[in-house]
Amino acid sequence: MKIFKTVYRTVVAVFMLVVSSCLFMVPAIASTPSNVLVVGQIAEPKSLDPATVTAVNDFRILMNVYDGLVRYKDGALEVEPALAESWDISADGKTYTFKLRSGVKFHDGTSVTAEAVKFNFDRMLDDSHPFHDTGPFPLSFFFSAIEKVEAVNAGTVRFSLNAPYAPFLSNLAYPTGLIASPDAIKKHG
């Protein structure tokens, strides 16, 4: 009888050990809410401000949050329309006029206008702008050829360059050329 109790206890102990170890093998159930997207990144972004960001890790996020006037076609270095539906380049190559898509809104609900585009470039290029910020390693030099940005009307923005500058459109497609809401910048910096 003593042997039976010992065998019984051993069998029960092994069974409990097996059952308890199986609990650790159950896959973890994600606790992410259904309206949240989780994206793996190398590190936390330093900023979400296109004018200040210089890290490739941050660029990946910005390119999924903001749009620029133009962007690169998927898998190519060819520029295509984004916030701008079209553009004209003057014969001398010094003036770029962009027609903006109508009805486009920023995440905060404000409209994307020529004034918003002008605000973004003015704050990047004008040291005296009240919201001037280019971060510790400014990439604003991509736009150093810009002499003036004009909001011709709500849907048209014009860039005047100091000389013809072939990479201008390509530079607009770079993350530094992304357009953020002026209201959000004024509110959050």
Sequence positions of predicted segments:
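Surface-exposed binding/hinge segments that line
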Residues: K118, P136-I185
